[in-house]
């Protein structure tokens, strides 16, 4: 019997599917789903509680309420399976069919589906080419629409009001046909011949020139084509049959007290059925038109509410005044089907508890409370008890476990042995938020966590809770052990550095044991090895910090097994010698023979991992932790109030500052400085005073004097507890110590501005009431900020994950030669990020040639590991071309070589690695550490912004990039080109420093000259832009008429007069069209040409310029003719932190963005309009010039006649990434976004590898717009997936046809997520209704390529171990297909099931 049931069950196993298609349902299809028509609005009988016949819960339509039992009770039990009761008409089967059987309602009149009507752009409106307003008026019975115009002068689709309709009737009689309501729209949709219409529109498109019209036509053609391709019929957007959800999905549950809780859908369905039945009755009675119309309108509204309540008009509310939840609300939003149930399922076999420290654990262990383990592993225990014969049945085993017999604990030990569990701490911001451990049973009720994994979890023990999950199957356990075990996750996937790093106590302990002390007990002793040194310390013969000599044996790794041995006597301390005992063979002694802070310990672990591999590193990390805890306890570090020593100079410094402030106050009152300057100066004074106090304090804290062996006084690093904690990096920082023992300093108001009275007290002295009040200001803002930040950061992560979720490594090599050029990041005089850091773990895109020779140093496609990076440094190579995901040629996914090293493992990335999600997590996870605020520039900052010279830090050679210069009359070099870069190179020609030099700067040294450090190489005036002559000659004024275009001003102090150009707004009507300029002529009055061109040398002057020369005087090249004052833009806010990162990834166009040159050519200015000037760029080959209107208030960087290259900055401002992509290409936009994002993270000290940002950029660039389709299948102006264009163009060029011409688009991450090929992924992200409407009309097919789609349909994801599974599945699919082709036709499914049921019935 059991076997038979098994056979029966195996019959209904679902087939593997490859894709999911969404389309419009035709009325016949809806009827085919249905098991019967619902005719009555009744639900259940109030006395018997049985469902009413033909009602919304009818058992005849939807199936029996109880398993294998008909409604009237005539047939019960399994043996009547499949019988239909002749009395109540119910089929005897399982009651779960009530979850899958649907019903339907035959509507008395067609009804428009609100999604296709109101979800913008309205599909019905687009198809009929009618405005939405008009369609609505027809649908809701306000106007008529002409369905058939006949022989009249009316037009089809024309809207007539009641009055116009009556007039037309009088005039034409029944020549024409006009209707209202959904039936009219249905007739119109029915009458469209899609193919004909489509061809007609294509012809129109080819003949029309207006941009807006073309856009509209393209939209309609796309819609029509999608209907043709998908075999959807337009009239299916109008419902004639309404499907009804299975009743168990909209349940009616009895509550105690005789009341019922019901799903809102039942109310909505009831309204529909009531109105539909009433309408049927009215139609049978042939009631007056106006009544029928009203009923039809009400039915339309009822169905609108059922499908999407509140989309049109007021939402229908229930008895308790809240809007009813419609079908659309069921699937959208955070509580909808997608995000609540499909992507966020709850997990069985899990528990949670508070965490506490387990300092004695090994790295791969965690402490699990016995009580929890017993509950979590129950089924395993039952199984074991039964298998061993200790319990006869499961019930008996259950009793034993409940009684907690002693044998149960032994069994639990066996079960748990080598069965990993997963520990998760919410919020899981990156993949290290879930790791696997082997459980160790402990008493108590708290989970014990290994201290070293706290950093990965971001956990602390102040009441954090964690969840435990049990992997059940063998495969799951194997996966947890091999991939998720904490010992396999030593490196952070974000930057490839160890994340298992000691912190706090451990760091303090190691720091303490590696410190030196002058004249400590046992100084100068010599030991034969570390063991002896430790013994001496334990016996009390010497102190931990004593400087001694120890014989040390170092091992250097040659290959996997062999080491090179080297023994020598080293000067060290006892503590370091003890620490050397736990260091694994293969690491050099110098790494331990120094004071170890947090950074050095991290470096030690990193080196250990790179040289000795995983196993040694894990053991070493554990040993470090035990040793650290041990010696931290012995150090006895504690915080006492006397440890916070206040510097003696403090009061003097503060009183000096107060005197300075009062001086400034006096100047302000006598009117010498403005209020703003006073405020900035006061703040600067206090900031400087605070610096001085804290310097004095740190000097005081960090050193102490002691007597050495010779009896002389000597300074040594202090053993002050607070200083040691900060110095080792265990806890606290100089800034915090400053508040304890220096002065608290300046505080900010909640709006970010600084309060000018600082808090001069520190926490040791205590604050008075005013000081306390001021400090609460900032503190509250901090708390509010944190709350906001968490939400914003979470949303950013969600968008990033969504845009990148389908990127997986799918092949080894795409063989592309493209790549990005890597150089070190240098700003001013300091290297922000070296080439080594940037290139590590990348694959070279071209051979790297040895400098000054033609030998190949590193071949193409080499993975640059630490060894190769040393080679790069040795040959001082400063720029290389490496592969990048942005340029990867793989169609779906990325190849391993373009990605490079898997940062968390340290080798080339494996196929199936979900790099998209990892990138998103790496960028999103530190989001909460970024600031939320925008910075206000003021005080010290604003002065730094206006530098006026370049002083070099290193000696070297000067290199000028794209510099044009002239020599002025004083023999100095003046720069006359824009965006000049000045670099300082060392003797290997490596860039050491890099500066931007503005137009008009005076340079002290020429290209390729030597400079010494500290030399000033360039100077300029930061407040004005000069106009510099490039030729010699005489000045001639053009259009400079006193009172009309210029005015003369006399300076009161010097008595000199100067000519000032009037702004257009200040000129008289006569002077409006004048264009003042300085022209340079030779002695005969002829134009002088700019060298190398045929442009006369004349300089147009913008308003407010100050002219520095007079008419017809002689000038020589390099002289300043005029100065344009720079408007000090006041305090411009810089968007920083999280909002800046979000702006970059959303590719938002900044306000007042930089204007870039669209083409290369010469600049000239045309006729101005009221508020704008006309900029004209004439290309070098005199083709059609490019014109642009620019607002007058924009400061331009270019003068008439200047040459610009495509993409040069014409007017300063923040650059728009879209412009950079259009004018400078993919490479430039990649570089721009990476640098800008890294800038924000660098400020917070967060390290993220560039390749993660590149992964997101690749996803932002995945669409392109077709400019000219040529022979391809695309439309002009259509936006298409870039990979599709690539594939299509490859195929076209193979057969020798013209390929499509396209331009790449940059989409923000939200847009890119919604524009993904997969509609399931897009619908579950945002705007569910719109996505589903669009996809169903187009009959979209989801190939289930991404991770999200597969999670939603409940399959393994195509990444990691699931990647192999899907590959295998596809192989088998193809095999089966070929088999089926060759297989002779066999018995049909129907016959088989008939035979089976016969067999079953005979045996029962």
UniProtKB/Swiss-Prot annotation:
Subunit structure: The RNAP catalytic core consists of 2 alpha, 1 beta, 1 beta' and 1 omega subunit. When a sigma factor is associated with the core the holoenzyme is formed, which can initiate transcription.
Cellular component terms (Gene Ontology): DNA-directed RNA polymerase complex
Family: Belongs to the RNA polymerase beta' chain family.
SUPFAM superfamilies from the UniProt entry: beta and beta-prime subunits of DNA dependent RNA-polymerase
The protein's role, per its UniProt record: DNA-dependent RNA polymerase catalyzes the transcription of DNA into RNA using the four ribonucleoside triphosphates as substrates.
Pfam (any one): RNA_pol_Rpb1_3
Record's keyword terms, sorted: DNA-directed RNA polymerase, Magnesium, Metal-binding, Nucleotidyltransferase, Transcription, Transferase, Zinc
Reaction(s) catalysed (UniProt annotation): RNA(n) + a ribonucleoside 5'-triphosphate = RNA(n+1) + diphosphate
Record-given protein name: DNA-directed RNA polymerase subunit beta'
Keyword Secreted in annotation: no
Any one GO molecular-function label of the UniProt entry: zinc ion binding
UniProt binding sites for Zn(2+) 2: 814, 888, 895, 898
Cross-referenced CDD domains: RNAP_beta'_C (cd02655), RNAP_beta'_N (cd01609)
SMART domains reported for this sequence: RPOLA_N (SM00663)
Gene3D superfamilies associated with the record: 1.10.132.30, 1.10.150.390, 1.10.1790.20, 1.10.40.90, 2.40.40.20, 2.40.50.100, RNA polymerase II, clamp domain, RNA polymerase Rpb1, domain 3
Source organism per UniProt: Buchnera aphidicola subsp. Baizongia pistaciae (strain Bp)
